[in-house]
Regions:
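Formylglycine-dependent sulfatase
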Residues: 2-259
Length: 259
C-alpha cells in the first residue's frame, strides 16, 4: 500500500532497500514493467482490483474515510466469481471499502457491507490504514475488541513525519506498530490450516497489507536494515513477511499448486 515501483530491488538495482523475497516471487512469475493503476490511492485501487471496474468510470475516484460500502450489493467481485467455482474465499488485511454506517460504527450489531458481504467467507483485518482512529481489528463481522480505550498518537517530525498516527479511540492493547506482524500471522495460519488438513476444496486468499502506508513503524529488529530510513526499514519488514507467506506455501506443499 503506497509502495513505489523503484522500491523493490528487482526493479531498481541502485535501490537502498533489498527485497529478496519479493524479487524471488518476480523471478518465479511474470513481472510487468509498464503497468498502470487506474487510481493511485487506497479506496479506488482496491475497488478496481476486487470488482474489475475502472474506478474512473464511477464516483469512486479518491480515498474514503467515512462513507459507507462502495461496492454495491449487486456488483460481482473476484471473490464472488471464485466462490461460484467452488473456492473457499478468505481476506486478511486492509479493507478500506467501507462498512454500513460509515464512520459511525454501531458495535451493538454485526458490521455489514464489508468483505463477508462481497464474496468472502472469512475476514480478519482493519477498516483502513492505521493512521487515524478508530483503531481496532475486525474478524468476520465483529470487532475483536471494541475501541473503548484510546491512544495518544504520534505527531511525527521532519523526515520522520510519516510516523504519524492520530490520537483517538482504540481497542485495548492495540498497537499500530504491530499491525503488519499480526496480519502476517493470520495469513500464514490460513495457509497452514489448509496445507496441514485433508481439505480438498481450493481456496483464494486476498492478503492486503497495510504497509508501507504511513505510519512508518518498523519493528525493532528491522530498524537500520536498509539505507533508506524508517520507510526503507518498513519495506524490509514487509519483504520478510512476504517471505514468511511464501515459506508457508512451500512447507505445506501448496507452492506447486498455487497461482
Amino acid at each position: 500500500d503506497d509502495m513505489g515501483y523503484g522500491d523493490c530491488s528487482i526493479n531498481n538495482p541502485e535501490s537502498k532497500i533489498l527485497t529478496p523475497n519479493i524479487d524471488q516471487l518476480a523471478k518465479m512469475g511474470v513481472r510487468f514493467t509498464d503497468a498502470h493503476s487506474a487510481a493511485a490511492v487506497c479506496t479506488p485501487s482496491r475497488y478496481g482490483l476486487l470488482s474489475g471496474t475502472c474506478p474512473a468510470r464511477t464516483d469512486i475516484n479518491n480515498f474514503t474515510a467515512g462513507r459507507g460500502p462502495v461496492i454495491d450489493p449487486d456488483e460481482i467481485t473476484i471473490a464472488d466469481l471464485l466462490k461460484e467455482q467452488g473456492y473457499a474465499t478468505h481476506m486478511i488485511g486492509k479493507w478500506h471499502l467501507g462498512f454500513e454506517g460509515g464512520r459511525a460504527f454501531d458495535f451493538s450489531k454485526p458490521l455489514t457491507g464489508g468483505p463477508l458481504d462481497c464474496g468472502f467467507d472469512s475476514y480478519f483485518g482493519v477498516n483502513k490504514a492505521p493512521s487515524s482512529p478508530p483503531y481496532f481489528y475486525i474478524r468476520d463481522r465483529e470487532p475483536v475488541a471494541k475501541p473503548e480505550g484510546s491512544i495518544d498518537g504520534n505527531e511525527g517530525k521532519g523526515m520522520d513525519r510519516r510516523e504519524i498516527y492520530r490520537k483517538g479511540e482504540a481497542a485495548p492493547g492495540f498497537k499500530p506498530e504491530e499491525i503488519t506482524e499480526v496480519m502476517c500471522h493470520e495469513a500464514v495460519k490460513v495457509i497452514r490450516d489448509y496445507g496441514e488438513s485433508d481439505k480438498k476444496q481450493p481456496f483464494f486468499l486476498y492478503y492486503a497489507l497495510t504497509s508501507p502506508h504511513s505510519p512508518w513503524l518498523p519493528s525493532e529488529k528491522f530498524k537500520g536494515k536498509s539505507e533508506a530510513g524508517n520507510y526503507g526499514d518498513f519495506i524490509v519488514q514487509l519483504d520478510d513477511e512476504v517471505g514468511r507467506v511464501a515459506k508457508a506455501l512451500k512447507e505445506t506443499g501448496l507452492e506447486k499448486d498455487t497461482l
